[in-house]
Amino acid sequence: MKISDLPIKNVIASNDSLIVDNNGTSTQRIKATDLAFAQFAFLPQTRNQIIRGKSLGSAFTEWHKTEIKTGMFNDMFLGDYWEYGGVKWRIVDFNYYNSSENNAKNHIIVLPDQNLSRSAATSAENSTKNYCDSLMYNASASLKSRFATLFGDSHIMGHFDSFANDYGGSSTYPYYSDEALARGGIFTTLPDEIMLFGTHIMASNQAGRNANIHITGRQFAYFKCGAPMPTPTEDFWLRDKSWYNYFVCWRSYRVNQDIWSNQHGLRPFAAITGEPN
């Protein structure tokens, strides 16, 4: 019987299989659901455009490291995750810092699906302080160890970032001076509105604000593709300042703001490489 003699099927079910000629050495089959992603194996540039959401297991293996190191990212897509320590460590971008870092290694951006700890935004003696060196800044930096238990400390890439630093203002004129501090060697830190939503929503966009500068100007691809916020029932801080003593947060299923003294969750992200740094 010829293939052309077989009945035509217009819809493929998830458990259907297709025949694969394995380079002339054998005949194998592949499930239809796997074929949908396997066909992009040699097109790593598609990784920031496709959401899959598959479990990658509970260990960061040598195979994972090799695929990241080479920049091929085979069998890794947006939304894929490692489940370790009761947390889903989800891929939200590929090579995010390639446009802002000289000779950046191939990397993935990993954001946990839930809060890793809680903190006030800053302290009473610095109630109008900006994000840089605040309580939540330092607390997020200390959470590098949580990432290291899964990925290994040497695979967490330090990157340059831009943080709101000095602050001058009052409740009447909330921003008459502030500045952005470019700082290297950042391993784990909180995302801002640009990274999650692609634009400023609650953060002040007042003219003359140097601290509005953004290191890449790019939204994490996972959210750019329309993925919902993981575990939206949890509240957590973002690093943007919305008023002279208020910061942006996620709360009540939406972008919100809260005063510096209240505690919210911390969900820092990290850039993970395939080779040691």
Where are these regions (language model features)?
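Short, surface-exposed terminal/edge motifs of secreted or surface/virion proteins that either
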Residues: 1, 20-39
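Short, intrinsically disordered N-terminal pre-domain segments
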Residues: 1-15
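Residue-level signal for functionally critical sites in structured catalytic/ligand-binding pockets
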Residues: 6, 16-17, 26-30, 267
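A ubiquitous, low-specificity "background" feature that marks scattered single residues
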Residues: 11, 21-22, 27, 139, ...
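Collagenous Gly-X-Y triple-helix signature in extracellular proteins
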Residues: 40-277
